[in-house]
């Protein structure tokens, strides 16, 4: 049996990961084990590290975090037929999901257990580093666009579906979630309006956005409203601080679907110095009540996205099994944003956290293993 090592979150709010031995996770009947060639980091990883008593309260430490992996299949459960040892894959590691809560399914280790329906074959031309940028962004975008409790759009296909005649607004097009959402929406037959900084206009357009707007412009919402004239809204996906409020302003003045899928959580502009947990909860609840009430007055509904929900409703299979392998092979879906490699080895994951905290634009921080 192989030996395994992991970058453990040793305790709640412990400031540094600890790299040490971890159990090798043999697969259950409906699981596979992947030897990771690369992993990606996401803001949720270092937010759990710094605010562990506010979110993901069910985690029992020490714990292995991480959601994005790419590597080679080394073991398959007896009921798995779609994968074989040696297959190159990417996968959404769902260890932090409340219904899973299992370090063996965390990304930040040498070997990770994956669910076949959240795993996709990748072409030989695609590096593990590039593939690792996809899983969580794909799942989050897919949940927001296609789940029935979200926008409920028709599913993507490869090749893309014919145009529906509807337009979806994606606020934050150069983010990881936004980059995936643009491509998914286009593959599903929707026109995409998105926002980005001016330096990322070309980037968003290459992913398939029909129109890109400068989110820093003081007239951005009015510019989008004017562009929607004569068009029918399919709803909005809001990513990043301030995106939800801006999407509400736009949807209040356009025809069609008035629903916002919320991919980001509001955070206080200033970190509370005392009673941190209580004050943060009060801020969060107050924001939700205020936002929902404003939406009620305008006839606009909204819902927060939980990426792991795609594992429980068939959307995960539709994305990772039915769509992504063919789309990657045909070049109709590209890994985006580009990978920015922070280093090699599990010891580099904490460094990757720090790099991402500083902010990146149209990039995703990746660690080679």
From Swiss-Prot:
It is a single-pass membrane protein. Glycans are attached at residues 79, 101. InterPro entries: ADH-like_C, ADH-like_N, GroES-like_sf, NAD(P)-bd_dom_sf, PKS_ER, Trans-enoyl_RdTase-like. NADP(+) binds at residues 44-49, 197-200, 215, 360-361. Residues 13-367 form the Enoyl reductase (ER) domain. Keywords: Glycoprotein, Membrane, NADP, Nucleotide-binding, Oxidoreductase, Pigment, Transmembrane, Transmembrane helix. Its EC number is 1.-.-.-. GO terms for molecular function: nucleotide binding; oxidoreductase activity, acting on NAD(P)H; pigment binding. CDD domains: enoyl_reductase_like (cd08249). This is Dehydrogenase pigH. GO terms for cellular component: membrane. It is an enzyme of class 1 (oxidoreductase). Dehydrogenase; part of the gene cluster that mediates the biosynthesis of azaphilone pigments (MonAzPs), a complex mixture of compounds with a common azaphilone skeleton very widely used as food colorants. Within the pathway, pigH might be involved in the late steps of yellow pigments monascin and ankaflavin biosynthesis. The first step of the pathway is performed by the nrPKS pigA that forms the hexaketide precursor from successive condensations of five malonyl-CoA units, with a simple acetyl-CoA starter unit. As colorants, MonAzPs are widely used in various food products for centuries. Moreover, MonAzPs also possess wide-ranging biological activities such as antibacterial activity, preventing hypertension, lowering cholesterol levels, causing hypolipidemic effects, and displaying antiobesity and antitumor activities. It is found in: Membrane. The gene is pigH. The keyword Isomerase does not apply. SMART domains: PKS_ER.
């Amino acid at each position: 049996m192989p030996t395994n090592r992991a970058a453990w979150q040793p305790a709640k709010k412990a400031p540094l990961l600890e790299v040490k031995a971890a159990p090798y996770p043999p697969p259950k009947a409906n699981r596979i084990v992947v030897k990771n060639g690369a992993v990606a980091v996401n803001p949720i990883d270092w937010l759990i590290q710094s605010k562990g008593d506010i979110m993901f309260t069910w985690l029992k430490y020490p714990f292995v975090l991480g959601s994005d992996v790419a590597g080679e299949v080394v073991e398959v459960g007896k009921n798995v037929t779609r994968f074989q040892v040696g297959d190159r894959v990417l996968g959404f590691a769902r260890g932090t999901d409340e219904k899973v809560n299992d370090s063996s399914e965390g990304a930040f280790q040498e070997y990770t257990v994956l669910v076949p329906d959240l795993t996709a074959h990748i072409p030989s031309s695609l590096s593990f580093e590039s593939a690792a940028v996809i899983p969580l962004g794909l799942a989050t975008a897919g949940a927001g666009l296609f789940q029935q409790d979200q926008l409920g759009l028709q599913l993507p296909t490869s090749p893309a579906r014919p145009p529906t005649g509807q337009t979806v607004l994606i606020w934050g097009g150069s983010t990881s979630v936004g980059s995936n959402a643009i491509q998914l929406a286009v593959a599903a037959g929707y026109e995409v309006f998105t926002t980005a900084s001016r330096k990322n206009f070309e980037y968003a357009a290459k992913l398939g956005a029909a129109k890109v707007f400068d989110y820093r412009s003081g007239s951005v919402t009015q510019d989008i409203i004017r562009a929607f004239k004569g068009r029918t809204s399919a709803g909005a996906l809001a990513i990043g601080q301030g995106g939800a409020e801006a999407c509400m302003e736009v949807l209040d003045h356009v025809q069609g679907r008035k629903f916002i899928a919320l991919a980001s959580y509001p955070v206080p502009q200033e970190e509370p110095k005392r009673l941190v947990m209580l004050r943060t909860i009060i801020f969060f609840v107050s924001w939700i009540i205020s936002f929902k009430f404003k939406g009620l007055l305008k006839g606009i509904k909204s819902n927060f996205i939980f990426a792991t929900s795609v594992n429980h409703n068939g959307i995960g299979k539709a994305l990772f099994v039915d769509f992504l392998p063919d789309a990657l092979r045909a070049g109709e879906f590209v890994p985006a944003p580009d990978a920015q490699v922070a280093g090699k080895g599990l010891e580099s994951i904490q460094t990757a956290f720090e790099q991402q905290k500083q902010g990146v634009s149209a990039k995703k921080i990746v660690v080679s293993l």
